[in-house]
Design a protein with these regions (language model features):
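Short, hydrophobic transmembrane alpha-helix segments
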Residues: 27-40
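N-terminal membrane topogenic signal
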Residues: 4-18
Length: 221
């Protein structure tokens, strides 16, 4: 694909920053018996991720900060993913052990937090890895796509000129994957995209079927 001429274009980072803050809030708000790490660790992780993201916006996507942002974002996904799975395992252990420490409302709130965190962290990962990252997409230097969006096959009059997916598109991809548990309007093209969507769907399925359903049963009894 031919690159665009002129100064490089940078995608807005405020939606990503809001998502990171939301993930940190959800991880911090979990009950003590579910949370894996102390609160201060969550805050340290948050600042470590938000600093390079803010620097990318302030420096007009300077290459050095883009590199740091990509590494830190992928590390954040890894840490948040491990915490999410660990929190889910703790919830299931509490259910199987019939722990009296959590009532139905706490269990429902915790399962909702795990489900939303799952959606948000996978959305960030999809946004960061597809076609080489956001700036590669914005400037026409993107690599092989991992997903095919419906706008790419739509008539020219139906979409904006030189349309490229932004974070909101990947947020919707993450949400639809977790709700439908399958492919919707956006099609995975690579093996890693399919495996990641399978993993997200599996976490969402366990959260809904095992944890949330048990919470509803407790509240109804």
């Amino acid at each position: 694909m031919n690159s665009r001429t002129g100064p490089p274009h940078a995608e807005s980072r405020w939606p990503v920053a809001l998502v990171i803050i939301a993930v940190l809030f959800l991880l911090e708000a979990l009950p003590e018996q579910v949370r894996l790490l102390p609160k201060w660790v969550v805050y340290v992780i948050g600042f470590a991720v938000l600093i390079p993201i803010g620097a990318v916006g302030l420096t007009a996507a300077r290459a050095r900060w883009l590199h740091v942002e990509r590494k830190v974002t992928l590390l954040f996904f890894l840490v948040a993913g491990i915490l999410t799975v660990a929190n889910l395992v703790n919830l299931i252990r509490g259910i199987l052990g019939r722990s009296a420490e959590m009532d139905g409302l706490q269990l429902l709130a915790s399962s909702t937090g795990v489900w939303v965190t799952n959606v948000l962290m996978f959305s960030m990962l999809y946004w960061q890895i597809d076609r080489g990252g956001p700036e590669a997409r914005m400037n026409g230097t993107s690599a092989r796509p991992d997903w095919f969006f419906p706008q790419e096959g739509a008539p020219a009059k139906a979409v904006l000129l030189a349309w490229q997916p932004t974070f909101i598109d990947y947020l919707y991809l993450g949400y639809s994957t977790a709700t439908s548990l399958s492919t919707t309007d956006t099609v995975p093209l690579t093996s890693r995209a399919k495996l990641l969507m399978m993993l997200e769907s599996a976490i969402a399925l366990v959260t809904i079927v095992v944890v949330a359903s048990r919470a509803v049963n407790i509240l109804a009894s």
